[in-house]
């Protein structure tokens, strides 16, 4: 049985033991508070056109995202009506969840060590930063996560993963994520 009182995620321990020192040496930080760290990870599934015809699809996306994240996901709703898409205001269009703390480190560990190697023809992720030290990536199928039972899903959803850091530059954020074993391809 897992002792949750004394449990520390593997990547969180690695950050405090080795990654902090490596980042401090690499960028010459004078204070430990200058060292970039992970702030949160946001997961998003947009159920798209399927949810316009059937509102249960957004609920299905929410259940799958809850299983992946280990935390309750919320259903996202349309902000305004768009007649061309047959979309009405407050209509469910997807699901999202924000991970912080230990769950964030656990998810990042599962993402880099379990889910990404299961992606077909995987050659690494493209370094996609926003200029302020935040990283975003997309996955074509959410079924690469072991929490999803392939036999019970009706749709293979695409998924957005946004990793928010306290880094000021993209170089700092890329180095931080590389220390967390993020497999960049370039």
Swiss-Prot record:
PANTHER family, per the entry: 60S RIBOSOMAL PROTEIN L11-RELATED
A molecular-function term among this protein's GO annotations: tRNA binding
Subunit structure: Part of the 50S ribosomal subunit; part of the 5S rRNA/L5/L18/L25 subcomplex. Contacts the 5S rRNA and the P site tRNA. Forms a bridge to the 30S subunit in the 70S ribosome.
GO biological process: translation
Native source organism of the sequence: Jannaschia sp. (strain CCS1)
Pfam family, one: Ribosomal_L5_C
Cysteine-cysteine disulfides: none
Cellular component GO terms, alphabetical: ribonucleoprotein complex; ribosome
Family: Belongs to the universal ribosomal protein uL5 family.
The protein, known as: Large ribosomal subunit protein uL5
Record InterPro entries: Ribosomal_uL5, Ribosomal_uL5_bac-type, Ribosomal_uL5_C, Ribosomal_uL5_CS, Ribosomal_uL5_dom_sf, Ribosomal_uL5_N
Role description: This is one of the proteins that bind and probably mediate the attachment of the 5S RNA into the large ribosomal subunit, where it forms part of the central protuberance. In the 70S ribosome it contacts protein S13 of the 30S subunit (bridge B1b), connecting the 2 subunits; this bridge is implicated in subunit movement. Contacts the P site tRNA; the 5S rRNA and some of its associated proteins might help stabilize positioning of ribosome-bound tRNAs.
UniProt keyword terms in alphabetical order: Ribonucleoprotein, Ribosomal protein, RNA-binding, rRNA-binding, tRNA-binding
């Amino acid at each position: 049985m897992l002792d949750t009182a004394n449990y520390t995620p593997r990547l969180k321990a690695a950050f405090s033991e080795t990654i902090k020192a490596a980042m401090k040496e690499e960028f010459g930080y004078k204070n430990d508070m200058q060292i970039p760290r992970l702030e949160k990870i946001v997961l998003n599934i947009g159920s798209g056109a399927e949810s316009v015809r059937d509102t249960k699809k957004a609920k299905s996306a929410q259940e799958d995202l809850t299983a992946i994240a280990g935390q309750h996901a919320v259903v996202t709703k349309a902000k305004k009506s768009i007649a061309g898409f047959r979309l009405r205001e407050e209509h469910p269009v997807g699901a999202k969840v924000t991970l912080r703390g230990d769950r964030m480190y656990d998810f990042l560990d599962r993402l880099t060590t379990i889910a990404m190697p299961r992606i077909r023809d995987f050659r690494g992720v493209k370094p996609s930063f926003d200029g302020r030290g935040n990283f975003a990536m997309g996955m074509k199928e959410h079924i690469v996560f072991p929490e999803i039972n392939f036999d019970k899903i009706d749709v293979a959803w695409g998924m957005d993963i946004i990793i928010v850091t306290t880094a000021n530059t993209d170089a700092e954020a890329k180095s931080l994520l590389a220390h967390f074993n993020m497999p960049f391809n370039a």
